[in-house]
Design a protein with these regions (language model features):
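Flexible nucleotide-interacting loop at or near the entrance of a catalytic core
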Residues: 1-53, 269
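Nucleotide-binding/hydrolysis machinery
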Residues: 3, 71-76, 135, 151-161, ...
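Conserved RecA-like P-loop NTPase ATPase core
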Residues: 12, 36, 58, 81, ...
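The cytosolic transmitter module of two-component sensor histidine kinases
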Residues: 22-23, 29-33, 135, 201, ...
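Conserved post-Walker A coupling segment in P-loop NTPases
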Residues: 25, 38-105, 115-131, 196-201, ...
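Substrate-gripping "pore-loop 1 plus following alpha2 helix"
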Residues: 106-110, 136-156, 165
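Bacterial C-terminal helix-turn-helix
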Residues: 248, 280-335
């Protein structure tokens, strides 16, 4: 038993080291993540605007940091801004800066994020939460590479590479008139879709290993083994909170562990398993796109229900819809 644990953990460590050496904190060897990392490499050396799309907790900031670190701007620190973290008035001042006396309480000049990010990259997280009234100013600085501080008419030139991220459906927001179409097209130059953790189960053992050792080191614990059954249990879970949720679960496990073997303790209600074996298997030479299209046709375009495509594929309805969206499959065109 002990020798098997050692062998399994040595294999995980070797895979982990190979990944970490190329992309720092990004962990993943699945096909889904390999596709993401290829896109990161392709776009990093340009100055093109990047839009990172993905659910909460998928690691969008890590992707932004990787793009910056691989770019020619990596000699300067990447500047970060969360558009959902403050009200519109403060957000405008934080982005563009202000002059003394520009508004009540502006007792001194302030340099904004666009100015701080000159010759570097600016990461705008949760860009879908930017108020409509601020969006024209963001569009202008992207188009003209110039702006004014609040309370000033002086144009300031800036050389900034923008990386934006959101967990919201910007296309739908444009339709609903909650997001400007011209800004959307300006941001959507090079979109990168970050898959949720449930679509990359092969990466879970690597992530568990990385989080366990990182957290154990931080807490001064010595944990050098992770049982195979623990990895299987974690791999079967759905993870609605994605990588962030997994990291929190591992932190709890490290806290509760006594000894050098990770002890996983989960309340029963937390264990929501993903389907283990699909009811319909791919035919020889059939890829994921072809499999889903075939099953949708056989199901007459029905996704949910006992005879729906999701049930036949052994997937949750939301998971199948997410994959259909990623692969560009429209069920209405198949019936």
């Amino acid at each position: 038993m002990k020798e098997r644990l050692v062998d399994e953990n040595l294999a995980l460590t070797e895979q982990l080291n190979n990944v970490e050496s190329e992309f720092g904190e990004i962990i993943g060897r699945s096909e889904a993540m390999n596709n993401v990392l290829k896109q990161v490499e392709m776009v990093a050396h340009s100055d093109s605007t990047v839009l990172i799309l993905g659910e909460t907790g998928t690691g969008k900031e890590l992707i932004a940091r990787a793009i910056h670190n691989l770019s020619g701007r990596n000699g300067r620190r990447m500047v970060k801004m969360n558009c959902a973290a403050m009200p519109a008035g403060l957000l405008e001042s934080d982005l563009f800066g202000h002059e003394r006396g520009a508004f009540t309480g502006a007792s001194a000049q302030r340099i904004g994020r666009f100015e701080l990010a000159d010759k570097s990259s600016l990461f705008l997280d949760e860009v879908g939460d930017m108020p409509l009234e601020l969006q024209p100013k963001l569009l202008r600085v992207l188009q003209e590479q110039e702006f004014e501080r609040l309370g000033s008419n002086k144009l300031i030139q800036t050389d900034v590479r923008l990386i934006a991220a959101t967990n919201r459906d910007l296309k739908q927001m444009v339709i609903d008139r909650e997001f400007r179409s011209d800004l959307y097209y300006r941001l959507n130059v090079f979109p990168i879709h970050l898959p949720p953790l449930r679509e990359r189960p092969d990466d879970i053992p690597l992530l568990v290993k990385a989080f366990t050792f990182k957290i154990a080191r931080r807490m001064g614990r010595n944990i050098d083994s992770i049982p195979a059954e623990t990895l299987r249990t974690l791999t079967r879970m759905e993870w609605p909170g994605n990588v962030r949720e997994l990291e929190n679960v591992i932190e709890r496990a490290v806290l509760l562990t006594r000894g050098n073997v990770l002890q996983l303790s989960l309340p029963e209600r937390d264990i929501v398993e993903a389907p283990r074996t699909p009811a319909v298997l791919p035919e020889e030479g059939e890829d994921e796109y072809q499999l889903i299209v075939r099953v949708l046709k056989e199901s007459n375009g029905v996704v949910a229900g006992p005879k729906g495509a999701a049930q036949r594929l052994g997937l949750k309805r939301t998971t199948l819809l997410s994959r259909m969206k990623r692969l560009g499959i429209n069920k209405d065109e198949l019936v």
